[in-house]
Regions:
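Short Gly/Pro-enriched turn/cap motifs at secondary-structure boundaries
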Residues: 114, 129-132, 156-159, 173-175, ...
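Alpha-helical interface subdomain recognition
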Residues: 1-89, 101-106, 113-118, 143-147, ...
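Short glycine/proline-enriched turns and hinge-like loops at secondary-structure junctions
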Residues: 64-65, 133-135, 159-164, 177-180, ...
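Hydrophobic, small-residue-rich alpha-helical packing segments that form membrane-like cores
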Residues: 132-133, 148
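A short, Trp-centered hydrophobic/proline-enriched beta-strand micro-motif
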Residues: 117-125
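Long, acidic (Asp/Glu-rich), low-complexity accessory segments flanking structured domains
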Residues: 216-233
Length: 412
């Protein structure tokens, strides 16, 4: 097994790191304090290809592999976790579903703009009464001639208010349950679309989360993404890839916290020596680094499987997201402890990292949902099992998932 990176992968990692250190780190505390959206910084990252990492060059993207993508996200999250999630959403749950399910006209209209970073995308599944239970959404889409009229409310929309295209999920056939949900490409200029409010969040404050109001929002029939009733398939396939991105985000935050803690331990003195000379601090740092490396391996393995054309990545991305999101919360807690009172101050980077990390166990599937996905796959594999050492996994039988839309069913 080769754990080395190609020259292109190292170049992407190093270029993004240099940009983040020079352009983003100097302003992150101020932007976090003010809750200022990182529009200029995201535009520059888009010009570098970070908004369309996985999009083929023919559509304006970088045409990079998933390993390069997670390396990019880790470097961004190491300094600004909120910026990383804005990029993850545009890449994983907007561009990829559009690339797979979009018509030729939809691809031409939206994909190059997304890939070049000229606009961001937003994924609109969650509603006030429907989080983990996606089939419980209440937003309706009713056809009137050549348009659909959407009515409902979408909540916790990352990039909401800043995106140029929204994938909105609505019920076209309420009687069909999970098979009655369809996906639509919605522009903020469409009649009936309104950003109702922005959330005042504990963390990820430089990435805005909005509530959307849809009142007879008119969406042309040609803006339906995929077939009627296939909306949750579109959503879950996107989330399979998105969870790899969130795993990378967790690794990046944790790496930033580790570096800050190690530097502090080498300069902070107590009882006549640096605190890094005490075994208690050394063991905390050692545990932090070990957990980060374990999470990094899970994330990069899931990314490698995706690049290898594996028939299913859902359980792998769920494991990566589960472990990384819980790992980073343990790591940032240790980082605050190592910093002592300084770690409780807004002047400390680890204070922000502590707040930013908390949501990772919630969005793009809670830890509890990840465990359900993992266990369902494990218990349903009654024939052939995935080779845990890296061979291409064989898709589980139907019993592995009672909702087929939760399984990854194809490549890009």
């Amino acid at each position: 097994m080769d754990f080395s990176f190609s020259d292109d992968q190292r170049l992407i990692r190093d270029t993004v790191r240099e940009f983040m250190e020079a352009e983003v780190r100097p302003t992150i505390r101020e932007r976090d304090r003010e809750g200022k959206f990182s529009a200029d910084e995201l535009r520059k990252l888009g010009e570098m290809g970070c908004c369309g990492m996985l999009v083929p060059e023919e559509w304006g993207g970088a045409g990079a592999d998933t390993i390069s993508y997670v390396l990019m996200l880790e470097e961004v999250a190491r300094i600004d976790a909120a910026m990383a999630v804005a990029l993850s959403v545009t890449n994983s749950v907007i561009a990829m579903p559009l690339l797979k399910h979009g018509s030729e006209s939809q691809l031409k209209k939206y994909l190059p703009r997304l890939a070049r970073g000229e606009t961001l995308g937003a994924f609109c599944l969650t509603e006030p009464q429907a989080g983990s239970d996606a089939s419980a959404i209440a937003t309706r889409a009713v056809r009137h001639g050549s348009v659909y009229r959407l009515n409902g409310t979408k909540s916790w929309v990352t990039n909401g208010g800043h995106a140029g295209v929204y994938i909105i999920f609505a019920k076209t056939d309420p009687a069909a349950g999970s098979k009655g949900v369809s996906a639509f490409l919605v522009e903020p200029s469409f009649p009936g679309f309104r950003v109702a409010r922005f959330e005042d969040k504990m963390g990820l404050r430089t990435s805005h989360s909005a509530e959307l109001s849809l009142v007879d929002c008119e969406v042309p029939e040609e803006n339906r993404l995929g077939d009627e009733g296939h909306g949750l398939r579109v959503a879950f396939e996107g989330l399979d890839g998105g969870r790899i991105g969130i795993g990378a985000q967790g690794v990046g935050i944790a790496q930033g916290a580790l570096e800050a803690s190690a530097a502090y331990a080498k300069q902070r003195r107590a009882f006549g020596k640096t605190i890094g000379e005490f075994q208690a601090i050394q063991w905390m740092l050692a545990d932090m680094q070990t957990e980060i490396e374990a999470a990094r391996c899970l994330v990069q393995h899931a990314a490698w499987l995706r690049d290898s054309g594996a028939r299913t990545i859902g359980p792998h991305s769920a494991r990566a997201k589960l472990y990384s999101s819980e790992m980073v919360n343990r790591v940032v807690a240790k980082a605050v402890q190592i910093h002592g009172s300084q770690g409780f101050s807004r002047e400390s980077d680890v204070e922000r990292m502590y707040r930013d990390a908390r949501v990772l166990t919630t969005y793009e599937g809670t830890s509890e949902i990840q465990r359900m996905v993992i266990a369902r796959d494990l218990l349903g594999q009654t024939r052939e099992r995935a080779d845990s050492r890296g061979a291409e996994p064989v898709a589980a039988g139907a019993a592995a998932s009672p909702r087929a839309g939760e399984r990854f069913t194809g490549g890009r």
